[in-house]
Amino acid sequence: MSDYFDLVKRRESCRNFDPNRPVEPEKLRRCAEAAWLAPSACNGQPWKYLIVTNPELAAKLRPLMQGLGMNKFLNECPAFAVVVQEPTVIKVSASQRLKDQDFAPIDVAFSASQFCYAATE
């Protein structure tokens, strides 16, 4: 348990990147793997990850994530992940009260958090 808390204490939200230093594909794959292993309601896994390392694709996607002048750090970022919430149909056998609940935003947040913790490691 203490290893986990050490990881939580070390994690940071990095905004300073060297655009000339690529991120190793294996590190990106491990982060994505950690994200895919996140818990989700009824194992719905309502997420898709697009790992962007191609400079041309990154140039097309950056403006979509920089609305209101935010996320300017992406201009220097050599790789990033786009997390997409996918629609899921959760079969609820235990209770009808849960059938119209939207758990996907919470599940996606869990998944993205695990991606970030893996990046810290």
Regions found by a protein language model. Give the residues of each.
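Helix-adjacent hinge/juxtasegments
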Residues: G67-V108
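Small-aliphatic-rich amphipathic alpha-helix that forms the alpha element of a beta-alpha
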Residues: R11, A35-W36, A81, Q96-E121
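N-terminal amphipathic, basic helical "cap/leader" segment at the start of enzyme domains
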Residues: M1-F80
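Short, flexible active-site-adjacent loop segments at beta-strand->alpha-helix junctions, enriched
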Residues: P55, P87, E121
